[in-house]
Amino acid sequence: MKGFTATLFLWTLIFPSCSGGGGGKAWPTHVVCSDSGLEVLYQSCDPLQDFGFSVEKCSKQLKSNINIRFGIILREDIKELFLDLALMSQGSSVLNFSYPICEAALPKFSFCGRRKGEQIYYAGPVNNPEFTIPQGEYQVLLELYTEKRSTVACANATIMCS
């Protein structure tokens, strides 16, 4: 059954127009987590490809190490990889953040250096500042891109905390 699920997942990523993701249709909205007054949703904003992302434990109190899962098939080689994050609340910018994930001289993850067509699957801890998510609704734009500014993954996320 795992083989069938993996095949179906790969088919969806490789042929989005056959699975409802291409041809001008939006990708589905995915639930990252939903628990105890916190709900995090995302939708791929890359017209060509969706990806998988989840968080192990959903909590308003963000810990310094959270375990995530991320999976995607690469359309570009990764020599260098960067993350841009923009956080908005009520139409106003709250935070803009850029972070180098893979640098030529300093690869931080095992997937740094992967080639076009290969799969990235990361399951493990991510270091971040520990804080409590304030009550409210937030929009987050996340973009992973290469040194050539080619998009690897893009997501519009919504965080709702009550």
Swiss-Prot record:
Q: Known SMART domains for this protein?
A: ML (SM00737)
Q: Which residues are glycosylated?
A: 96, 156
Q: Which Gene3D superfamilies match?
A: 2.60.40.770
List the cysteine pairs that form cystine.
33-58, 45-154, 102-112
Is Secreted a UniProt keyword of this protein? yes
- Signal peptide positions are 1-20
Q: Briefly describe its induction.
A: In monocytes, down-regulated by the cell-wall fraction of Mycobacterium bovis (BCG-CWS).
Q: Where in the cell is it found?
A: Secreted, Extracellular space
Can you supply one Gene Ontology CC term for this chain's record?
extracellular region
Pfam families the UniProt entry points to: E1_DerP2_DerF2
Q: Which GO terms describe its biological process?
A: inflammatory response; innate immune response; lipopolysaccharide-mediated signaling pathway; positive regulation of lipopolysaccharide-mediated signaling pathway
InterPro entries per record = Ig_E-set, LY86, ML_dom
> Keywords assigned by UniProt?
Disulfide bond, Glycoprotein, Immunity, Inflammatory response, Innate immunity, Secreted, Signal
Q: Just give the chief location class.
A: secreted
Q: In which tissues is it expressed?
A: Highly expressed in B-cells, monocytes and tonsil.
What does this chain do?
Answer: May cooperate with CD180 and TLR4 to mediate the innate immune response to bacterial lipopolysaccharide (LPS) and cytokine production. Important for efficient CD180 cell surface expression.
* Assembly: M-shaped tetramer of two CD180-LY86 heterodimers.
Q: What is this protein called?
A: Lymphocyte antigen 86
| Organism of this sequence | Homo sapiens (Human)
